């Protein structure tokens, strides 16, 4: 293979340029030309296929900066319709005209789903990225746990019930994804900063973090030492939450709560999806979980509690919300993300050169080897209907009574943040939380 294309698709993450850099470095070593396709899958719909030569004469172009967030190539949320064979044939012809023999797609579970029809026509592989850390499997047979419902009504949806209450962390397929560690650093720093406002004004802060339906970002926000963490994998127990908030507020005169944007109530309804809208990829927009939770606390706790303490005139005055927002997705990636993103970009090049197709580079972890790159056939991620689902945080990672990471969850996080840049994360904070549990 002499010429490869690479594109970045889906939401931006801090480590995308590092992935591109890793692919360029490996392509240079193998004397393979690397063409960057501009604006993700969208480039494939353009007759010109906008592109840039990333390694002329097998040297990096200076614009590639692995320490810079975002993506030099641009991204989109467009995907290829697997049933549109005319468009797929046209895309294949366009890439052939550029003499591109294989394609690397940098993305998450949506991109892995989207590359399937391309892989049926020419070699295509995935280099992983997502701040949500929801690309992968908790254990190899996890796709078999999905069930499809609603066929009779026409409202088809998928549900899953974990078959294992415990599992070995070494079984995880794609232990962690580049972009996640940086997003955790930003979230934890936001929690720490908002704490001082809550302390100063005797208030209750609800901080919303990203992650969609997976609780990994909220879980690791424990590095910022919130009092309570709420994750989507465990439906909200409002009465328990109110009791816990009252207990903490009585003790220390302030409370900091981290709430995942995909949080659900006891009936399974998403708190942040009260207004139905979708993003360009068709995903339901989750925005407002923290506000919905604040309204519930205001109603349940009432004004008299705060007036009795003489700390606020009303519950509405005492309880406030903040979103960490898109700062989790942007900015300079920390060293852990830069290093392993580059390794995975290089692995994707190797996969194509070695003749693989419809495969994903992954970052694995074991007690004996630590972190190391590997790969899996993309079909390993698919359920019986051929669909790839976002990975949920395993319920065993969270203690629903204490409303914080469980010992298993802490064991999961430690390898990541022990190896992350010590200038960006404070590993000792997790030990403090463990001692308090």
Feature-to-residue mapping (PLM):
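N-terminal phosphate-binding or glycine-rich loops at protein starts, especially the Walker A/P-loop
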Residues: 1-49
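Short glycine-rich or small-residue beta-strand-to-loop segments that form or flank ligand, phosphate
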Residues: 3-11, 71-76, 101-106, 204-208, ...
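Short, ordered loop/turn segments at secondary-structure junctions
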Residues: 9-12, 37-43, 77-78, 108-111, ...
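Short glycine/serine/threonine-rich phosphate/pyrophosphate-binding segments
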Residues: 13-23, 44-45, 81-89, 106-116, ...
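Accessory alpha-helical/coil subdomains and C-terminal extensions
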Residues: 34, 102-107, 113-117, 123-125, ...
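Glycine-rich oxoanion-binding loops at beta->alpha junctions
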Residues: 46-103, 131, 143-171, 176-192
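C-terminal non-catalytic interaction/assembly regions of soluble proteins
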Residues: 273-437
